[in-house]
A protein has these predicted regions:
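Short conserved segment of the HATPase_c
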Residues: 174-186
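Acidic ATP/Mg2+-coordinating residue in the GHKL
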Residues: 169
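Short beta-strand/loop element within the Bergerat-fold HATPase_c
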Residues: 151-161
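Short alpha-helical Gxxx[C/S/T] motif in the catalytic ATP-binding
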Residues: 201-205
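Conserved DHp (HisKA) dimerization/phosphotransfer helix of two-component histidine kinases, i.e.
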Residues: 54-108
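Detector for a conserved hydrophobic position within an alpha-helical segment of the HATPase_c
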Residues: 209-210
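Conserved glycine-rich
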Residues: 214-215
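Short helix-loop "hinge" at the ATP-lid/N-box region of the Bergerat-fold HATPase_c
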Residues: 140-145
Length: 240
């Protein structure tokens, strides 16, 4: 039904995650420098009226791009290290409010419409980790959608003493062979140079769900397109 309601951050795991947090924090300073220094070089050369060759300009642009991706990846890894370890105190939260908040934080493109059926249910957990969970799952759907517009459907129901949530989109979907791998940190189905994504979002989602004693998985869907992600969370007041 569910695993014990515990934190993943214990013993050696806690030490490893503290190291990850410190390491990513320090590396982010280097990544920001890598993003800024090419601009300084360009400004200095412009002040001296030096015109860069096309190849040199492309190389500087490439350096900025890779530095930006590195910074995004380090930010995502920092968020992963914070789950459970730096969590807010557990409390009861209105599921509809959590989902609506995540929907408002989605990027403007693609334009996704959120349909919610939360049934007035409440869940128990740290607010910051629950926000990370819904941002990760809904954000993953937006990041990989292949159209300018689409739909997200979030349905919740009671399940024993817990609340089961299913998030479905109408994007391109994922082949069943990859349904497990996508929850691993830094996992992407295409090269990061093509997608621009860190591959950490669903790893964050899995860590939050497991820290709250649940499980998360991709489930089969009868729709011709799309993906459905299902997970369970501790209910509040008997799940309602």
């Amino acid at each position: 039904m569910s695993r014990p309601f515990t934190s993943d951050s214990q013993g050696p795991v806690q030490e490893a995650e503290e190291f990850l947090y410190i390491m990513t924090h320090d590396l982010k300073a280097f990544a920001r420098a890598m993003r800024t220094i090419p601009d300084w070089i360009g400004e200095d050369l412009a002040a001296q009226r030096v015109v860069l060759s096309a190849d040199a300009a492309d190389n500087l642009a490439m350096l900025r791009d890779y530095a930006h991706r590195l910074d995004d990846t380090l930010t995502a890894l920092t968020e992963l290290s914070r789950v459970a370890r730096l969590a807010d105190p557990p409390a009861a939260h209105d599921l509809e409010a959590l989902v609506t908040g995540a929907c408002t934080r989605l990027p403007a493109t693609p334009r996704l419409t959120c349909e919610t059926q939360c049934g007035g249910l409440h869940v128990t957990g740290p607010l910051n980790d629950l926000n990370r969970l819904f941002d990760a799952v809904l954000g993953n759907a937006a990041a990989h959608h292949d159209r300018d517009f689409g739909n997200l459907r979030i349905v919740a129901r009671t399940w024993h003493d817990r609340v089961q949530v299913t998030v479905s989109d109408d994007g391109p979907g994922i082949a069943p062979a990859h349904w497990t791998a996508v929850f691993k940190p830094l996992a992407t189905l295409r090269p990061k140079s093509e997608t621009g994504h860190s591959g950490v979002g669903l790893a964050i989602a899995r860590k939050v769900v497991r820290s709250l004693g649940g499980e998360i998985a991709i489930i089969p869907t009868e729709a011709p397109r799309g993906l459905s992600v299902r997970f369970d969370l501790p209910g509040a007041d008997g799940g309602a």
